[in-house]
Amino acid sequence: MTIDDDLSRIAEQEKVLSFDAFDLTTAWQLGKLLQELATERGLGIAIDVTLHSMPVFYAALPGVTPDNVNWVRRKRNMVLRYFRSSYASGLKLQKDGKTVEDNGLSGADYAPHGGSFPINVKGSGCIGAVTVSGLPQRDDHNLAVEALALMLAKDLDTLRLA
């Protein structure tokens, strides 16, 4: 797939993977689902679910290092700044030949890499982010999308990046 193909598919993901309502219980369920998927697959990842600026779920599975904590923070910052997935932001920067620094942001605080996805609520927009770190960026992104698709009973095959 080309960058444009990926950006188009991610835009569709962000549109389709939207909740009617999302609260602290839903946040916990999303984080727990990701933890279960990762454990079943033996994935060493960090998982974070944040509403606005409030962390509501965090898990670090075997294999995670302190670096993953920082990656989570930096990827999440991309979503909370631009209200789109960190992977989409990174692909757009790559397509345009730009960096986060070109947008006046610090690379120490913003990571335009896959793994953080907006938590969107219909009629409200982005209210937070779900973030995965520990895999290659495309896999981090796909795992977050998979969990959201499962929670929302959406067809993952039509949403997943190839």
From Swiss-Prot:
<dbReference type="InterPro" id="IPR005624">
    <property type="entry name" value="PduO/GlcC-like"/>
</dbReference>
<protein>
    <recommendedName>
        <fullName>UPF0303 protein RL3365</fullName>
    </recommendedName>
</protein>
<dbReference type="InterPro" id="IPR038084">
    <property type="entry name" value="PduO/GlcC-like_sf"/>
</dbReference>
<comment type="similarity">
    <text>Belongs to the UPF0303 family.</text>
</comment>
<dbReference type="InterPro" id="IPR010371">
    <property type="entry name" value="YBR137W-like"/>
</dbReference>
<dbReference type="Pfam" id="PF03928">
    <property type="entry name" value="HbpS-like"/>
</dbReference>
